[in-house]
Amino acid sequence: MSLDINQIALHQLIKRDEQNLELVLRDSLLEPTTTVVEMVAELHRVYSAKNKAYGLFNEESELAQALRLQRQGEEDFLAFSRAATGRLRDELAKYPFADGGIVLFCHYRYLAVEYLLVTVLNNLSSMRVNENLDINPTHYLDINHADIVARIDLTEWETNPQSTRYLTFLKGRVGRKVADFFMDFLGASEGLNAKAQNRGLLQAVDDFTAEAQLDKAERQNVRQQVYSYCNEQLQAGEEIELESLSKELSGVSEVSFSEFTAEKGYELEESFPADRSTLRQLTKYAGSGGGLTINFDAMLLGERIFWDPATDTLTIKGTPPNLRDQLQRRTSGGK
């Protein structure tokens, strides 16, 4: 992994009681040792694999103003991180779920792009077995379950300030207003809606195949083509490129897919991040509720699976062997 750390700072927030968070600030930057580089590489890998929301700084963002000064050389990175941690403590103190943690600021470069990663990591306790096979207590940073994370694409922010995607962050778990306080701390608002872009793409594909008057098999083949392209982009960590996708679909219609989306006003960006859960709808139908979970390949609709919209009834012809075996045993009174 071609990752180079420019500067990295570490501080701590300790929850003493329900209303107070103690601030513990380092007096020096961390040295980019092999261990530190491995930790940041793991953070980068875990964060890059997660679905993210996209945003941009508000005009009055204190963090953006301080970061701009730091980038211009008017403040050093350590001072920037110490002041920002203080602002983070003030925001966290407003919320009852505030737990504290290890606050990390890392300016690094990956594949010619500069990033600033900001995260609050939990420092957890566990056990380890030493070389004498004795069990001893140990502590570790819970990187895999980090949910208070934001990353600023410094290259994009500085070269294209009108962008709506240079800042990314993780949505908080259900029931926690993590995104709320972190957005307040960042002084940011949501920008590009990746899910909406992906939903728009799916609708455009359906309309494109309908206008081309394709039969059912041909429509499904196009959907599979779109899914294959988008999934390859997702696996490679690349965005969906509308023009590239249009080339993949050349021959489907006299009008190219990119021309079709522009003429019909789908408002799709030239490129946008792939959303795994939305793209899955290209090849599968899935849903759950009321104790029922259903998931099946789209090609089966109208062949083995039939839906009557008038009665909202789904009819399945031919059940999976393992399901059929369970049904037979239960209905015959067996266990």
Swiss-Prot record:
InterPro entries reported in the protein's UniProt record: Nucleoid_associated_NdpA
Q: Which domain of life is it from?
A: Bacteria
**GO MF term set:** double-stranded DNA binding; single-stranded RNA binding
Q: Which positions, given as ranges, span the membrane? A: none
| Keywords on record | Cytoplasm
Query: Where is this protein localized, as stated in its record?
Result: Cytoplasm, Nucleoid
What Pfam families does UniProt report for this protein, alphabetically?
NA37
What's the chief localization of this chain? cytoplasm
Any GO CC annotation of this UniProt entry: bacterial nucleoid
- UniProt similarity note: Belongs to the YejK family.
Q: What is this protein called?
A: Nucleoid-associated protein YejK
**What species was this sequence derived from?**
Salmonella typhimurium (strain LT2 / SGSC1412 / ATCC 700720)
